[in-house]
UniProtKB/Swiss-Prot annotation:
Organism: Rhizobium leguminosarum bv. viciae
UniProt-listed Enzyme Commission number(s): 2.3.1.-
Source superkingdom: Bacteria
Location(s), subcellular: Cytoplasm
One Gene Ontology CC term in the entry: cytosol
Gene, per the UniProt record: nodA
The protein's name: Nodulation protein A
InterPro entries: NodA (IPR003484), Nodulation_prot_NodA_CS (IPR020567)
Lineage, uppermost ranks: Bacteria, Pseudomonadati, Pseudomonadota, Alphaproteobacteria, Hyphomicrobiales
Length: 196
């Protein structure tokens, strides 16, 4: 599958309005089937749902956007330890390409992780994605962690809602410049911002 797509690795500032429109359409079509609310942030042409990524890996094929992964460097707190990570998020594969191996092509982001000199990449996924993530992690490149809660700020302020939410999600950790044994202990991760 990776030979049929071309990858564009770019900084957020390199995207044009037309790129954001195409990505917003991609996210509506990709996230919409998982629940109408999941596509809502993208209905206005915005190509991000919470925090805005600084780098993106976008795969294109003859039908447009095929896959996407966003990256944002940030400090999170794991237990009592502040930790610089590259948060990975805004992951999607066009529905007609699911199951064809394109997820493994997201490894196009790995050289960027090394270039940014972050100790770890970090991301979260729903428990419903566990089987998919286990297949992805089978080669030991990434690790799935369970039993962790992640607290994030809401992307928008609402007077009738709390400012943060705490979720029980699967945590994906990719050792980049440090071994997995150096990931801090702790059952709560403070994202200190909105989910990517």
């Amino acid at each position: 599958m990776s030979s049929e797509v071309r990858w564009k690795i770019c900084w957020e500032n390199e995207l044009e309005a037309s790129d954001h429109a195409e990505l917003a359409d991609f996210f509506c079509k990709t996230y919409g089937p998982t629940g109408a609310f999941n596509a809502k942030p993208f209905e206005t042409g915005r190509s991000w749902g919470g925090a805005r990524p600084e780098r993106r890996a976008i795969a294109y094929d003859s039908h447009g956007v095929a896959s996407h992964m966003g990256l944002l460097r940030r400090f999170i707190k794991v237990g009592t330890t502040d930790l610089l990570v590259a948060e990975l998020g805004l992951y999607g594969v066009r529905p007609d390409l699911e199951g064809l191996g394109i997820a493994h092509s997201v490894r196009a982001m790995f050289p960027i992780l090394r270039e940014l000199s972050v100790p770890f990449a970090f991301g979260t996924v729903r428990h419903a994605m566990r089987n998919h993530m286990e297949r992805y992690c089978r080669d030991g490149t990434a690790n799935i962690m369970t039993g962790l809660r992640v607290r994030s700020t809401l992307p928008d302020a609402h007077s009738d809602l709390p400012a943060t939410r705490t979720e029980d999600v699967l945590v994906l950790v990719v050792p980049v410049d440090r071994p997995m044994t150096e990931w801090p202990a702790g059952s709560l991760i403070e994202r200190n911002g909105s989910e990517l």
